Amino acid sequence: MKAADARAMSADQLKDELGNLKKEQFNLRFQKATGQLEKSSRINEVRKDIARVKTIARQKAAEAKA
């Protein structure tokens, strides 16, 4: 996910996306533990996407207060 895509989302959509990313991260960790993970770089991509979504959600919340 690109930052521009996340910025275009509403706060509710960001929450939904964050939930989806956390579920995906859990599944990837589970696959890694069981030796079924084929694309290990996806773990880092998802981790960075989670950080990106959290950052943008926080920025939007700060803008709403100001």
Swiss-Prot record:
Gene Ontology annotations of biological process type:
translation
The family database entries (PROSITE patterns) matched by this protein are listed as: RIBOSOMAL_L29
Gene Ontology molecular-function annotations:
structural constituent of ribosome
What cystine linkages occur within this chain?
Answer: none
What GO CC annotations are associated with the protein?
Answer: cytosolic large ribosomal subunit
Keywords (alphabetical) are:
Ribonucleoprotein, Ribosomal protein
List the InterPro entries hit by this protein, alphabetically.
Ribosomal_protein_uL29, Ribosomal_uL29, Ribosomal_uL29_CS, Ribosomal_uL29_sf
Highest taxon of the source?
A: Bacteria
Q: Which family does it belong to?
A: Belongs to the universal ribosomal protein uL29 family.
Q: Which HAMAP family match?
A: Ribosomal_uL29
What is the protein's name according to its record? Answer: Large ribosomal subunit protein uL29
